């Protein structure tokens, strides 16, 4: 398979490598679509891995089950899945009350090889942590890669309870800022103000 492998800051090489083996009680996902997050750009242009190279980034992953362990009955070959990128347990009190950033049992997702490749491993731990979601057939796969950033926007607006008739000021008209603007309108905000120093981004937001 091919993968975009990071060997150091700004040193990304597309190479042919061996396809990973299916893990016990896990599966192999054929990557169908993947987002390019701002954190990916930051990570690939800095020493984010602290010298632990080579590494494959990419965490906004949608794919199709290519191989699956016989002991993983929840999914089947051909299923289209979205992989939640973080490694929160989603079971502790912090996670269940909407504060997964304070997870009491976090894993080390940054050490896992990512989705800038033809295939990616999905472990039994990820499945048990409810980090794998089956997609309905009618969902656009490119749009589905944005599930995690959009869920972050939703959680933010839930926390501050944006509702009908509110006025909302959003600082920054990048992708997340635009998500916030759209979400605020959906929630009934009467006035959405965006503050941005980049004219191109502001025009895009309009």
Regions found by a protein language model. Give the residues of each.
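Nucleotide donor/acceptor-binding cores
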Residues: 1, 165-166, 190
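Glycine-rich beta-strand-centered segment in the early N-terminal region that forms part
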Residues: 20-34, 47-96, 136
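NAD(P)H dinucleotide-binding glycine-rich loop of Rossmann-like/cofactor-binding domains
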Residues: 91-171
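Surface-exposed amphipathic alpha-helices with a cationic face
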Residues: 158, 181-186
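Adenosine-nucleotide cofactor-binding segment
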Residues: 170, 185-206
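Short N-terminal strand-loop motif that marks the start
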Residues: 1-61, 120-122, 126-129
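N-terminal Rossmann-fold NAD(P) dinucleotide-binding loop
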Residues: 177-178
